[in-house]
Every structure is written in structure tokens, then in C-alpha cells.
Amino acid sequence: MKMLGEPEFKENILYYSFLNELFLILIRNGFSCSHAKLILDETRKRGLECSGQFEVISNSVEAPEPESLERIAKTLFTPRPHWGRLVAFLAYLAYLQKNSTEKLFWNDHLKKLKQIVKCHIVPWTLGPRDPKPKQRPFDKLPSAFYFLTAAASCLTLLLLYFRTTQTK
């Protein structure tokens, strides 16, 4: 299995260890290794692509406290989360750690991230997408098919009957 860090990031051990912690949080909450790896690969890509936007945000606010992580997550993932918001949230946190020379996210932050994933993301990924599943278009096919077949048979019998009576 390929290691999580890209070669240019291996110099930044704090960034690499933060990504590893995120990877473990996702796996411990029921994500498969391949899905967790895809999420973190996308997180790294988006972190690089959006670094200019993240720089503007990080200049205007300080690194989030554990309680503010919960508030941010509630606003991002309510009423319903989606993958783009999850990746953007993780990419911003990874960007903050990558550009910092000290550890930003301590055990309190990681516990809060575990709680966020468990409360907001896991129910969304494991639960049904729609509480009332849509009916497939061919669920009622047998009854409609039988009705149309019977109607066509009756019509055929009537046509045959009238044709035979007209020829007599």
C-alpha cells in the first residue's frame, strides 16, 4: 500500500502525522481503507488547489479551537452533508497544519474530529439516502403486462369472430 504522504510533504512530519490521524479516524468509524485513502488523496489535492483561498481565510482567523470545530461542522454538514463539504473541511484543516511550524491539532481536536465524523458523516454514509425509496419503474410491470395481454387477446378474438361472421 502506498504511504499517505506525497514525497514533497514527507519533510513536514506534522502534516503527515495529521493526515495519518485523519486516516485512522475515518477507518475506525467504519470507512473502508480504500474510501479513506480516496478521501485523503482528494483532501491533499484540494488543499493544494485552494491554497490561495485558504491563505486568505487563515490570515483573517486563527486556528480553530475544539469547540469551534464542532460549530463549523454543524454549519457545513447541516441539513445534509456531501463529499465536497467533507473534503473542503478536511483540506482546510490539513492546509492549516501543513503551513504551521508547530502542532495545531492536539488530542482535544482529534477527539472532536472523531465525534464530528461519528455524529455527522457516518450516519449520512451508512443510512439510506432517501427515507422513502423511490419505486422502480417496472415494479408494476407484471400486472400491467397481464392486463394488456388479456385486452389484446380479447380484441383479437372479437376481430376473428366478426371476420368469420362476415364471411358466412
Curated annotation (Swiss-Prot):
Keyword presence, Membrane: yes
Keywords for the protein's UniProt record, in alphabetical order: Host membrane, Host-virus interaction, Inhibition of host apoptosis by viral BCL2-like protein, Membrane, Modulation of host cell apoptosis by virus, Transmembrane, Transmembrane helix
Gene Ontology biological process terms in this record: regulation of apoptotic process; symbiont-mediated suppression of host apoptosis
UniProt topology in membrane: Single-pass membrane protein
Subcellular location: Host membrane
GO cellular component labels: host cell membrane; membrane
Residue ranges crossing the lipid bilayer per the database entry: 143-162
Domain of life of the organism encoding this protein: Viruses
Protein task: Suppresses apoptosis in host cell and thus facilitates production of progeny virions.
Protein's name according to its UniProt entry: Putative apoptosis regulator A9
UniProt organism field: Alcelaphine herpesvirus 1 (strain C500)
Gene: A9
